[in-house]
Design a protein with these regions (language model features):
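C-terminal end segment of the histidine kinase catalytic
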Residues: 162-165
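Two-component histidine phosphotransfer core
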Residues: 1-158
Length: 165
C-alpha cells in the first residue's frame, strides 16, 4: 500500500523528535507543529470516518524563529484524541488551531465529549494534563493562560504562551 511508507516515515519522525528534540529546553515552533501534523495524520488513519477533523496551523516557514518548550502543544492534542474520539460512536470531532501574534502563540483544541460511554468511564482524572500544567508552571511561570471548559457536547482547551525569538 502507498500509505505504509508514508506512515513509517511519519512514525520515524515522531520517534526522532522524542529522542533528539525533547531534551532541549526550547525548540522552533515549526518543529512542534510538524510533530502535531504527523501525529494527527496517524490518528486520522486509525479512526477513519469516525472522526471529523479540522486543523488550522500557520505556515511552518513563518514560525522557524519562534521558540517554545517541546511537547507542550502535543500533550493537549493527544488528550483530545484520547478522550474526544469514541470507538463506538461515529460523531467524534476534533478541531485544532494554532495562532501566533505579538510575542505569543495560542493553541485551541476542541473535541467531542461523550456521556457515559465505555470510552470515558473511569478516565475522568488522568495525570497527563496535570503533568503538562506542572510543566507550564515551571517553564512559563505567571506568563501563560490555560482555560479548559465544557461547552455543550465539546471540551475546549485554550492555551496561550509566550514565544522567544
Amino acid at each position: 500500500s502507498k500509505t505504509v511508507p508514508d506512515l513509517i516515515l511519519k512514525l520515524s519522525e515522531l520517534l526522532r523528535f522524542m529522542l533528539y528534540e525533547c531534551d532541549k529546553q526550547l525548540i522552533p515552533l515549526n518543529n512542534e507543529l510538524k510533530v502535531i501534523r504527523n501525529y494527527v495524520e496517524l490518528e486520522e488513519l486509525r479512526y477513519g470516518e469516525r472522526l471529523k477533523l479540522r486543523m488550522k496551523l500557520p505556515d511552518a516557514k513563518e514560525l522557524s524563529a519562534y521558540m517554545i518548550s517541546p511537547l507542550i502543544f502535543l500533550g493537549f492534542v493527544e488528550n483530545a484524541f484520547k478522550h474526544g474520539v469514541s470507538a463506538q460512536l461515529k460523531d467524534s470531532f476534533i478541531e485544532i488551531e494554532v495562532v501566533q501574534y505579538e510575542g505569543m502563540v495560542s493553541l485551541t483544541v476542541i473535541n467531542s465529549k461523550f456521556e457515559n460511554t465505555a470510552d470515558n468511564l473511569g478516565s475522568k482524572k488522568g495525570i497527563g494534563l496535570e503533568n503538562i500544567k506542572a510543566q507550564l508552571d515551571l517553564i512559563y511561570p505567571d506568563r501563560y493562560t490555560l482555560i479548559q471548559e465544557e461547552q455543550g457536547n465539546a471540551f475546549v482547551t485554550k492555551l496561550k504562551i509566550p514565544v522567544s525569538e
